[in-house]
Amino acid sequence: MSGVNDIRSAFLNYFAANGHEIVPSSPLVPRNDPTLMFTNAGMVQFKNVFTGVEKRPYQRATTSQKCVRAGGKHNDLDNVGYTARHHTFFEMLGNFSFGDYFKDRAIELAWKLVTEEFGLPKDKLIATVYIDDDEAFGLWKKIAGLPDSRIIRIAGADNFWQMGDTGPCGPCSEIFYDHGDKIPGGPPGSPDEDGDRFVEIWNLVFMQYEKLPDGSRLNLPKPSIDTGAGLERVAAVLQGKHDNYDIDLFVALIRAAADLTGADPHGPMKASLRVIADHLRATSFLIADGVLPSNEGRGYVLRRIMRRAMRHAQLLGAKEPLMWRLVGVLVREMGEAFPELQRARPLIEETLRLEETRFRKTLERGLSILDEKSASLKKGDMFDGETAFTLYDTYGFPLDLTQDALRARGIGVDIASFTDAMEQQKAKARASWSGSGEAATETIWFPLREKLGATEFLGYETEIAEGAVAALVKDGKEADSLKAGESGAIVLNQTPFYGESGGQVGDTGILTGDGVRVRVTDTQKKAGDLFVHLGTVEQGTLTPGMALALEVDRARRGAIRANHSATHLLHEALRQVLGDHIAQRGSLVAPERLRFDFVHNKPISADELRRIEDIANDVVLENGEVTTRLMAVDDAREAGARALFGEKYGDEVRVVSMGSTGRQGAASNALGWSVELCGGTHVKRTGDIGLISVTGESAVASGVRRIEALTGHHARHHANDAIQLAKTAAGELRTTLDDMPPRITSLMEERKKLERELSEARKKLAMGGGAASASSGAAGVRDVGGIKLMARSVEGIEIKDLKNLADQGKKQLGSGVVALVATSGDGKASIVVGVTPDLVTRFSAVDLVRKASEVLGGKGGGGKPDMAQAGGPDGAKAGAALDAIAAAMGG
């Protein structure tokens, strides 16, 4: 049971046998906590359960939670590789009680697991309790039989946990393992507690109070338990190691990296191998959970981790991208426990390979500048922060890499001056933005939103309504009126017009009132939820307070609805065909077309596109009801509703479901086949979409693909046009539609054969006496000052073939110069000049070809003294170019 996978299973199975629900790890991107960059503890997914906001069908749970600590307050990045127990990625084993058992049972369960199931010697274990937690102190004596000397009271925050400034909180109790006096360090609470002898392997949190805003505490009516045990630490103890990087999992990853680089796992570069092993886990799991490298937010933290590992790969002498080649080893070690690794393996490998390929140039340039700027520094000196910022800002060289590179030399970085330079740049950016006309125009909407409040949106239920003009805006300022012929922005108290958001374009339509008619050309959302109608007054004068009839262009809205619903179906179909790593990165929902951007690192094959289209159309043909529910955002996410990464949602969200629950891949909560958080407008039944036709697929950014499609009559017209085009082509080929593919294949093969024959004929013609210069002999060979010059002009021969012909010409002449000009159908010319070996000291092919290039309108040429090439746009002067070569030879 000493392997990492065995230990994980033993922990979960032990608590399952004791009435706990085994709950899968939540993603590294927190679903219900916008304050967290990454999931960093086992209790994160249960936060709302502990606070009473959410109810679960169980009162006891156990998990092995994926965690990342590499950004914000919890940031272990700089220490990774240099200490025994710091990691960017780790697993947190835990058991939880939601108002069920409390201290006595928690201590009993933990003690039995570590001593009976794991078999740790009791005399190697000590416990800590909060300084005034007499109850826990007594329980450790009673249940574990620990003497007073091995129960240590600890004051301060280390042994008292709280969720925030207010809310659930309580004392902690920790279990420590004693590695023995061969390892330096003292027990917890002692002056030398930071040594490695005593290692915390489990923390039990007793949530028994609620902290109030005034700082006072009340007893919770139902106290709860939250525990956390780092799997890597537990494994080290059970495997007889005092260093986490010596456990079986890390040994496998480190050995694989060492095999690929030739590094000694126990040599002077072992820290670099450890960095690579640790960072491989963090990057792979983050990518599997939908995070991609970028220059902001979670993507930037991922990029920093990746680049730090890549820098250490470079230190190990890796000449080619390394990280992606290690993913298979990680999947072998952890893929059974975390199937998402296996599903996302192609995406992980391709993302790592591309990122490392791009970063190598940045790394080489940055390290070169860093070496130059720090050459005069010695141990203990500080590297200039402004220069560090220039490396970051101009060359894309992250600060932590600068620090890491200088660390080995004992040189620090002046963080204060780095921060000052960063703030100065931000100030310049803000000044530039605030001085723009766009910024001045946009500022009008915030005070209007404060004054008028949110616009009430009626468009989910109707496309015709009545409303009153709340405000008019023209040229960035409030206006008293808009007259006939004038354009501006109209804010209404309520509207059926959808404001552009979530990828869906804004509505258009007509506003009419007493002698007034306004054509709305777009609707936008400003300052959050202020709907702004952009349009032109066609008749009358529009003034604030005027009552209007509001009518959305219903045909256009209907097409938009179909495209938006089709986007949802394509999203789910993409996931089924390509994998669970598919995550939305953007979309456009317009009346005539749709596009959907998503995470994927390689082109989609024609077969995959057809399967995606077929799956989506199968749901259309079901003609099932499209249901919309209003739900609490946390409930919606817990129910499996998909959300757009980075999108901000309110406390209550609309959940759009479509497709029967019996379909493959349907949500387990029975809400539907496709379930998404969405504020857009949708069809009532999937059959209203009519037809989905995928028209294209392309790349839009690194690791992001785009799929484009049509629906309804646009899709029908597209299909009809394609069929008619195919029929026309079949008619031209004198065949049927069914026989057209083999007919085209046959014609293409015949064409290739004819092209080969034509090429050979041209070559023979060229060497047998193609068109010569005006002063050449019949065979294109003449005497220039006693030197033979073969000068010929030919058509339709490629440059590579010209070189071969020039070599043949040199052999024919024995001694001499060969000049061949080939003209193409667009009038351009290519020229090759060859000089036999005995003449290269007298004539340079490079010099001669450049003389010809000038005549052809080109810009020089290049090559070697015995063979050079050039070109030019004016092929009509081929003969003159050959004469220029003869003149340069002295003829």
UniProtKB/Swiss-Prot annotation:
Lineage: Bacteria, Pseudomonadati, Pseudomonadota, Alphaproteobacteria, Hyphomicrobiales
List of residues binding Zn(2+): H564, H568, C678, H682
Family designation: Belongs to the class-II aminoacyl-tRNA synthetase family.
GO biological process: alanyl-tRNA aminoacylation; negative regulation of DNA-templated transcription
Protein's UniProt name: Alanine--tRNA ligase
Catalytic activity: tRNA(Ala) + L-alanine + ATP = L-alanyl-tRNA(Ala) + AMP + diphosphate
Cofactor: Zn(2+)
Cofactor comment: Binds 1 zinc ion per subunit.
Database matches in InterPro entries: aa-tRNA-synth_II/BPL/LPL, Ala-tRNA-lgiase_IIc, Ala-tRNA-ligase_IIc_anticod-bd, Ala-tRNA-synth_IIc_core, Ala-tRNA-synth_IIc_N, Ala-tRNA_ligase, Ala_tRNA_ligase_euk/bac, DHHA1_dom
Subcellular location: Cytoplasm
Gene name for this UniProt entry: alaS
Keyword Cytoplasm assigned: yes
Any coiled-coil regions, as ranges: none
Record function comment: Catalyzes the attachment of alanine to tRNA(Ala) in a two-step reaction: alanine is first activated by ATP to form Ala-AMP and then transferred to the acceptor end of tRNA(Ala). Also edits incorrectly charged Ser-tRNA(Ala) and Gly-tRNA(Ala) via its editing domain.
Organism: Nitrobacter hamburgensis (strain DSM 10229 / NCIMB 13809 / X14)
Keyword terms of this UniProt record: Aminoacyl-tRNA synthetase, ATP-binding, Cytoplasm, Ligase, Metal-binding, Nucleotide-binding, Protein biosynthesis, RNA-binding, tRNA-binding, Zinc
Domain notes: Consists of three domains; the N-terminal catalytic domain, the editing domain and the C-terminal C-Ala domain. The editing domain removes incorrectly charged amino acids, while the C-Ala domain, along with tRNA(Ala), serves as a bridge to cooperatively bring together the editing and aminoacylation centers thus stimulating deacylation of misacylated tRNAs.
SMART domains, per database record: tRNA_SAD
Gene Ontology molecular function: alanine-tRNA ligase activity; aminoacyl-tRNA deacylase activity; ATP binding; tRNA binding; zinc ion binding
Main EC class the enzyme belongs to: ligase
GO cellular component term, pick one: cytosol
Pfam families for this protein: DHHA1 (PF02272), tRNA-synt_2c (PF01411), tRNA_SAD (PF07973)
